[in-house]
Amino acid sequence: MRLAFCVLLCAGSLGLCLAFPKETVRWCTVSSQEASKCSSFRHNMKKILPVEGPHVSCVKRTSYLECIRAILANEADAVTIDGGLVFEAGLAPYNLKPVVAEFYGSKDDPQTHYYAVAVVKKGSDFQLSQLRGKKSCHTGLGWSAGWNIPMGILLPPDSGEEAAAKFFSSSCVPCADRMAFPKMCQLCAGKGVEKCACSNHERYFGYSGAFKCLQEDVGDVAFVRHVTVFENLPDKADRDQYELLCKDNTRRPVDDYENCYLAQVPSHAVVARSVDGKEDLIWELLNQAQENFGKDKSAEFQLFSSSHGKDLLFTDACLGFLRVPPKMDAKLYLGYEYFAAIQHLRRVQGTEEPQRVMWCAVGQHERTKCDSWSVLSGGILNCNSEDTMEDCIAAIAKGEADAMSLDGGFLYTAGKCGLVPVLAENYLSQDGKERFGSKCVNTPVEGYYVVAVVKKSDADLTWNSLRGKKSCHIAVGTSAGWIIPMGFIYNQTGSCKLDEFFSQSCAPGSDPESRLCALCSGSISGQPAHTCAPNSHEGYHGFSGALRCLVEKGDVAFVKHPTVLQNTDGRNPEAWAKDLKQEDFQLLCPDGTRKPVTEAQSCHLAAVPSHAVVSRKDKADFVRRMLFNQQELFGRNGFEYMMFQLFKSSTEDLLFSDDTECLANLQDKITYQKYLGPEYLQAIANVRQCFPSELLDACTFHGN
C-alpha cells in the first residue's frame, strides 16, 4: 500500500519522492576523508534508529565556510566547527547558532573549553615575545587556537589581517588567500590547488597538521590546543622533545599546559540555522550516536575516532556532547572577551570610534527617557532598548550595550553573565535630610526592606492565611516582588508549585495565560495591551504598580518599605492614589502579626541590597566616571537639573529608582557576590530551582 501511494505521488511530482525525509539531518563534510566517515556514520546509525528517524545524510563541500553557506541556503543542516568559525557563522548574513557543544576532560567533570598553546621544539632559543620573523604553523585562518588567540596576543590591537600576514617570515595558514597573502601559504604542503586548502587535502591543516608542520622542521612554532601533542605523541619520552611558550616569556613542559597557555577558548560546536534549524532533531541524533558509538561503546564504529585521518566530523579529543541552552547565540557561546578580540584582529587601523556608553533601556517609556538624556549628555551616551531586563543583561554581556541599573535579583543573573556592579543607588532618607555631593556618594549603601502590604480593612488576613488570596508583585525575578516572598513561601511549603499558592496574581514577566498574570491590567495609557509585560507597559508593573494592583484588585502586595509612604497622603497625584491615606494600609509580619507601615524595621520579610548599575569589567571604570559627571549635571540639585532629571520619571522608576538620592561608591563590594551577600544569594538559590532562567542557563553553560 505504501509503495502504491509513493508511485501515485511520484506520478504527480518526482521531486517529492526524491526529497530527504523531514527527520533527516544533512551533515556537511569538507573533504573526501570526512565524506567517507560520514558515510560510515550514516550506515551505522541506520542500524540502531527506528525507520522514522532521525536519519543522517552527507553533504560534501570544500571548506567550513562553504558548509556555513550551505546551511544558510538550507542545503545542509549541521557541521562541527572551531570557536573562531562559530564567530564567523554567527555574523550576518549567516546568523547560525551553536546548538551542541563537544566536551573534554572527563564525563564526571565535562569541560566545554580547551587551552590554546604555542608549541616549539626543545633546544630552540626564543621566547613568545621573540616570534617576529620566525616560521609558523597554524591550524587554519580564523581558528581559535591556530590564529585568533596567538595573533591577538602577538599583534597590537586593531592591526588587521595584513599586519598579521607580515609578522612571520613564512607560514602555513590553511584557508588563507594564497594569492593575496602568499607568505601565509608558503610553508603549506598541499599539491596544486590543494596547497593551503581549508580541509584535510592540505597536509598541514588542522591541529595534527599544524603539529606535523613543526615535527617535520618546516616551522619553528605550532599554534594548537593542549591535547594535540598528547594525541600525536602518546609516549612521554617523545613529548619531552617539545616545550610550550608561556605568556611570561618562559618555557614549560607540554604536560604543564594549565600553567602555560595563551588562552582558554570554547570547545568546538555544532552550528545550525537560527530559524528552522532542526535543533531538537540534531540533538536527538547526536545523543543517540554518543550513547551507541561514543568512547569505548563500539568496536564497529567510533564517533570520536578517525581511521581515515584526524578530527573528522568531530575532534578526536571529544568525550561527548552537551546540548547548548536555547538562549545561547554565538556571542554568548564565545564570551565577550574572545568575541571582541576577534573583532579587534579584523578591524582596519584608524577606524576606532570615540568612547561612549550605550545605556540599555527596558521598554518604550525607558527608551524615551534615555533618548532625552542622550541629547543632553554631550555625545557621551547612546541608547539601546530591549523588552526585558534579561534581554538587556544579555545585550551588555555581548557588547551590544554597556550599562543599566538593576534590582538585586537581576544583578545575580548579570553577575553570572560576567557583569560587575559599578555604582549603587543610595535612597532618600525617610527623615527628609538630604546628603549633598560627596557626602551622599561616599555614604555606605543601606538597601531597603521587603514588606508584605495589605489593606487595613482586611483585618483577618495574616502571613499565615495568605494561601488562596490574590497577590501583587512588582515583577518576576525582582527582590521585593519575587525572590524574597516566593522564597519564604517555598521554605514553608517545600514545593515548587508556587503559582498554585495564590488564587490569582499579577507577576509581570510570567506566562500571560497563567494565573500569575490573571490580575494584570495591561496598558493603562490606551496603548496596545501589554498584559503582564515585565516593563512599564503593564500598569501594575513596579512598586507603585503593585500597590495599585492591591488597591484595585488584590489582597497583598510585595514591595519595598517606602512604597506606601510615597503613594499616600497626596504624594502621588494620579487618580488611583490621590485619596489614599497611609493609615489605610498595614504590614504583614512573618510571625503572624500586623504592624503600621512605618514600622518596617521590625516587620519585614528581608533586608535586601539597593539597585546597582552594572557593566562589563572592561567598561566599568568609564561608566563610573561618566555617571559621576552626569549626576553632577542632572542629579538632585545638579547644575542642569531643570533641563533633565536622572531620578525622576514620567511613569515610575525609569532607568533609575525615583527615590534615588545619588549613585554611590560600592566601598569594598566590588563583586556581585559581595554586593548581594550570602543570605540573599541563598534566597535566590531557593527560588531559582523553581523558576529556571534561560539566560542563566546560557551564562553558566561553560561553568561560570
Curated annotation (Swiss-Prot):
It is found in: Secreted. N-glycosylated. CDD domains: PBP2_transferrin_C, PBP2_transferrin_N. One of its GO terms (cellular component) is recycling endosome. It comes from the Eukaryota. Blood plasma (at protein level). SMART domains: TR_FER. Its main location: secreted. Disulfide bonds join C28-C67, C38-C58, C137-C213, C172-C188, C175-C196, C185-C198, C246-C260, C360-C392, C370-C383, C417-C699, C440-C662, C472-C549, C496-C690, C506-C520, C517-C532, C589-C603. Residues 1-19 form the signal peptide. Residues 25-347, 357-689 form the Transferrin-like domain. Keywords: Disulfide bond, Glycoprotein, Repeat, Secreted, Signal. The keyword Signal applies. Glycans are attached at N491. InterPro entries: Transferrin, Transferrin-like_dom, Transferrin_Fe_BS. Belongs to the transferrin family. Monomer. Interacts (via transferrin-like domain 2) with CA2. This is Inhibitor of carbonic anhydrase. It comes from Sus scrofa.
